Each structure stands twice: as structure tokens, then as C-alpha cells.
Swiss-Prot record:
Organism: Streptomyces scabiei (strain 87.22)
Associated pathway: Protein degradation; proteasomal Pup-dependent pathway
Sequence similarity: Belongs to the peptidase T1B family.
Subunit structure: The 20S proteasome core is composed of 14 alpha and 14 beta subunits that assemble into four stacked heptameric rings, resulting in a barrel-shaped structure. The two inner rings, each composed of seven catalytic beta subunits, are sandwiched by two outer rings, each composed of seven alpha subunits. The catalytic chamber with the active sites is on the inside of the barrel. Has a gated structure, the ends of the cylinder being occluded by the N-termini of the alpha-subunits. Is capped by the proteasome-associated ATPase, ARC.
Regulation: The formation of the proteasomal ATPase ARC-20S proteasome complex, likely via the docking of the C-termini of ARC into the intersubunit pockets in the alpha-rings, may trigger opening of the gate for substrate entry. Interconversion between the open-gate and close-gate conformations leads to a dynamic regulation of the 20S proteasome proteolysis activity.
Alphabetized PROSITE patterns for the sequence: PROTEASOME_BETA_2 (PS51476)
Cited CDD domains: proteasome_protease_HslV (cd01906)
Keyword annotations: Autocatalytic cleavage, Cytoplasm, Hydrolase, Protease, Proteasome, Threonine protease, Zymogen
Cell compartment(s), UniProt: Cytoplasm
Entry's Gene Ontology molecular function annotations: threonine-type endopeptidase activity
This protein's name: Proteasome subunit beta
Keyword Protease: yes
Propeptide residue intervals: 1-53
Amino acid sequence: MEANTRSTGRLPAAFLTPGSSSFMDFLSDHQPELLPGKRQLPPTQGVIEAPHGTTIVAVTFPGGVVLAGDRRATMGNMIAQRDIEKVFPADEYSAVGIAGTAGLAVEMVKLFQLELEHFEKVEGAQLSLEGKANRLSTMIRSNLGMAMQGLAVVPLFAGYDVDRNRGRIFSYDVTGGRSEESGYAATGSGSIFARGAMKKLFRADLSEADATTLVVQALYDAADDDSATGGPDVARRIYPIVTVITEDGFRRLTDEESSEIARSILERRLEQPDGPRAALL
């Protein structure tokens, strides 16, 4: 890309060339080496040790969707970080929760946020929720080379569909394959345990308060059986990140709200360590 000439004050030609409304396409055309998936890694032997984010969960309710994540990052058998943030707003009506290689995942989220903002500025309107999910799918697919070297990124995407007036959840695989989930979803190392908990507790008529409690219950169950997932840490005042997306937009629960939910669950678990029980019939 040509450097901006200070004497004339002109923008580089790349900025004046007509193209698509995708910022990723712009980078791909003019500076592809800046895209995460285009970087060449040196040859390595064995698995690359890097911090990994673990468990993300999401659940819908009649007014929207809740997306939440634990706070632990691991590196092999070690705890790399106890208070990592894994849930981020993508734009006003959507959010992304990251699992997989933490550094690459955070970089991908930042690029995704920029992609959505760039599209809105160029087109004068937001992408549909389906369109946002497709853009994220393309970004994950571009990371396939890294994934083949053990640096996979597997996010969970959720948002409020203003056209359909409901919350929706999209999951992905390492190749960028996209699936829309019904009711609830989980990704990451503790996802199998979180999904099992949500399967027994989910109802179509959940209130927002019930939905936020459900995701923390699911993360607690995941932490109970998966060492890479962190449960509520009362001593350090570290609690799951819980976000809610409705017709009013994205909102992250305050630390006080999250701690209140977590503490109420911990108190109940003193009597029922395995959590709430679903009816047999």
C-alpha cells in the first residue's frame, strides 16, 4: 500500500479504489499479510503451547439470548490466567464468546468488530444477523492453516435478530462450518458437561433472570468435571462473564449482578452439590 504523501495530503490510491464493503476483502487485496490466517509460521516439532480459552455457553429466552463464559485460560496442564475475558460485543445486537487459542481468538474478534463497523459505515445499514454469522464463518475458515498446527479458534456467536424479533445462536467448527443451534449451545473443553446441564434445565419460556441463572449453573457443572474450566472464585472475586442481548441491545451484567447469581448457586450447592434435579417425567 502506498504511503500517504505529507506534502499533498492525499490518501493512498488503495483507499480511493472502488471495492466491496468488506474490510477483510480490502486487506486481502492490499495488505494480505495483516490477516491472521495469512501469516506463515516457522516449522515446529510437537504441539505449540499457548494459552487456551475454555468454556462458552449460550441460551435463548423469549426476549433475547444470554451468552456467558468462564474466566480460566489454560496452557497444557497449567492455569495460564484466572480472569481472562472471553465474551465480547460484536456490535449493538450481537456478541462473540471465544474458545481455543486465546491470542488468535481475541485478534479475530477485534477484526470481526471492525468488519461489522466498516460495513455499516460503507452501506449505511447493519448486516443481518445471518450475514454477521456468515462473515465470522469466513474468518474462521481463513484460520484453518493455524488450526492444523494446533492453534484453533472455535467461537460461539449469538445475537438478537431484529427482523425476526428473537435471539439466535450460531456454533462453528474449526473449518468455519456454521450451524444454528436451537435453544442452547456450548463450545470449549467443558462444553459436553455444560450442554448436559442445559439440556435438563432449558425451557422455552425462560425469563431473562432464569436464563442468566441457567448459564451460570451450566458453567458450574462444566467446572465440576473439566479441569480447564474455572468455576466462581469467591476468594478472588472472579465470576463468570454474563451478557444479555435483547431488542434494547447488548448488555453485560455488572460484577455485582454476576456475583449475586454465583453466590446464590453456591449456597444451594451446599445442600445439592450436583445441582438442581430435573423431573423424571
